[in-house]
Amino acid sequence: MQKPSLSQDLIWILKSVQSRRSTKGFLQKHSSLKDGSPNKKSFAQPISSSFLNRISITKIDDVDSLSDNTLYGIGRSINSLARLGIQSVIVPTSNPIGMTSPFKYLENGTVVAKKRKLSIFEELQQQQNRVIRVSEIFSKAGVLTRPSYSSVCQLGPEGPSVENVQGIFQALSSLYTVIVPSSILMPNVIEVPIDGNEVLAGLTYSLHKPNFGFWVDRIVILDKNGGMPCSKRQTGSSHVLINLAQEFDELAKTLPPYHRKNLILVRRCLKMLPDDASALITTPEDAMLTNPVLDKNPLIHNVLTDRSIISCSLPRDRSPITKTTVLRSGVPVYTFLGPKCLTDGSVSWERLWVLINDSFKRTLDMDAYLDRLKNSLAAVIIAGDYLGTAIVTYEQPDGTTNEKVPYLDKLAVSQGAQGSAAISDVMFNVMTDLFPKELIWRSRLTNPVNKWYFERSVGSLKSSKTPWKLFWTGDSHVRNLDRVNQYMSVIDKIQPTWLN
């Protein structure tokens, strides 16, 4: 295995950047990083956030089944993340059905291990062998490794935690990648193997210390099964993005047990971290950084853009198969149907007015707008605490009597929430689920967002009468000119309600 050159890796990294906006966002987020030199601040005193060490905690499942070449490719990705200012802690595990059986709690408070095929000593020896193997192969890929051959976690009253946090912090500050076994020290000072999920949770709990300059930026799970399967996408494809605040309960009911376990683990870890932290689940093969493959690397792409490689709101029948899922704590999404919400107090229209003005940088004539909605409102979708909104109306096309077409009247995201939170994507998915047959909207010909709109539509057409461009989407693709003309009549006749 030939060691990659710096220029080769830099080319790979730059290939993952989608746009100038993505590059700018990465630089703004990571401008607080140190300039590549170890942090000389004392670990005993809180330090300024301008010296944050950003950490990725990665669990590699079933390492024994992975080839040296696969681990080498993963090591190259880890090395590239380090060059981007993300230091990693790696937890290699065995097949969860095999040797590393989890402990269990008894009602009397004691902890015992489940029935094992090997003795505890033999299992610990295998854990050490995994750490050694990963460390040696990662080193060949250019990673500066610091292997730990015994447990770094201990079991306390609140669950697993890191025993010697400063030791890991010192290694990370010196730009080492720390590799730890799936084992834990019990209260009686006996080391036993443990499910890697518990080690991942213990590391997350212990290593996120912003006041001391250490920030857990993301959780990564490399699993041969990949991300969470999605029934709405092509067979074999995963969810692209999971907004946990909105989707966890439903997914916990419907996912297969194996994926449900990962879902619960990720939510457990993200609850310990800030809202902008994220998790990524993908296959070991997709996580490899290899020269012959020209596809974008999901780990590097996610660090650079805070997004998945493909957008979750793109038409699903046109999206490629993916085995990568990005998960965020996210925001709850509330849906209000019909004009009742105009008067029943369920929606704060004053806050919506502020949100729309902030998003569009214009002032809405709220009285005129509400007057328009009272006879046409179909749905109001609100993301989080008025971070974003989508307002859909029913409009009557020319030449029809009772037919109504769902029309996206407003899609607004507050300036502070625009970008990596993917609020627009989340709301767009809710809309298309509410109105799967058809949904239309319009945009000025000069609107820079038109590329985003075009990618999510199944058709678009410029108006010959007004400065608008028509977009439409839905399960029933429009195949005749009459229907398009009806859509066009809707967007041409709606009058704007801005004060300026």
UniProtKB/Swiss-Prot annotation:
Its EC number is 2.3.1.1. Pfam families: NAT. Residues 1-19 form a transit peptide. Residues 336-496 form the N-acetyltransferase domain. Its main location: mitochondrion. Pathway: Amino-acid biosynthesis; L-arginine biosynthesis; N(2)-acetyl-L-ornithine from L-glutamate: step 1/4. One of its GO terms (cellular component) is mitochondrial matrix. GO terms for biological process: arginine biosynthetic process via ornithine; glutamate metabolic process; L-arginine biosynthetic process; ornithine biosynthetic process. Gene3D superfamilies: 3.40.630.30. Belongs to the acetyltransferase family. N-acetylglutamate synthase involved in arginine biosynthesis. This is Amino-acid acetyltransferase, mitochondrial.
